[in-house]
A protein has these predicted regions:
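ATP/NTP phosphate-donor binding region
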Residues: 1-49, 53, 65, 87-103, ...
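Cofactor-binding loop segments of dinucleotide-utilizing enzymes, especially the Rossmann-like FAD-
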Residues: 12-13, 74-76
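Short, well-ordered beta-strand core segments
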Residues: 50, 71, 153-154
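Glycine-rich phosphate/dinucleotide-binding loop and adjoining beta-alpha-beta core of small-molecule
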Residues: 53-73, 79, 83-87
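Short glycine/serine/threonine-rich phosphate/pyrophosphate-binding segments
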Residues: 57-62, 161-167
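Catalytic core of DAGKc-family lipid kinases
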Residues: 79-152
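Conserved binding/recognition cores within well-folded domains
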Residues: 148, 155-162
Length: 170
């Protein structure tokens, strides 16, 4: 799938950190692409692409703030499992993007419904009970698959299960 790249938003991990703003803007401007830097509390905009400058936390924040919008992640953070490359690769990544030499990876998400609301889940959802037995009904596509009895349940996406296993040292 080729993206139409008219409006690109850049979402930095932390506005107070030293980002090469001029370099990033220059790389996109050199190819005639309209790029704007997004503030942390800015309302979601109509964008064709979000470029997340940070680690996996920034990527997840971009998914949450701009649902359905493709996210290109450049690792400026600590954990870069979901990123296309590191800060040093920025010029090459922009060139590959402009040349159309990329693959869009679709990520599976979960819809978690709970009393009082629902949320999209990109990694995993954890339900825990302290000091008591928990009975949890698990549904897939509105069909109950089982009731789980225990002190907790973790349900993860393929992306989230990898992160969860890595955090456990596996």
């Amino acid at each position: 799938m080729m993206l139409e790249l008219r409006k690109i938003g850049v979402l930095p991990r932390d506005e107070d950190l030293d980002y090469p703003v001029d370099e990033v803007r220059g790389l996109f401007d050199a190819h005639g692409l309209d790029v704007s830097f997004l503030e942390a509390d800015a309302a979601p905009a109509d964008l064709d692409l979000v470029v997340a400058l940070g680690g996996d936390g920034t990527v997840l924040r971009a998914f949450d703030r701009f649902p359905g919008c493709p996210v290109l992640a450049i690792n400026f953070g600590t954990v870069g499992f979901l990123t296309a490359g590191d800060r040093k690769d920025l010029a090459q990544i922009v060139q590959l993007l402009v040349d159309g030499r990329y693959v869009v990876s679709e990520r599976l998400v979960l819809l978690c419904r709970y009393p009082g609301g629902e949320d999209l889940v990109y990694n995993e959802v954890t339900l825990r009970a302290r000091h008591k037995l928990l009975f949890t009904d698990v549904f897939v596509d509105d069909a109950k698959i089982r009731t789980i009895r225990g002190d907790g349940v973790v349900v993860g996406t393929p992306t989230g299960s990898t992160g969860l296993l890595m955090s456990m040292g596996a």
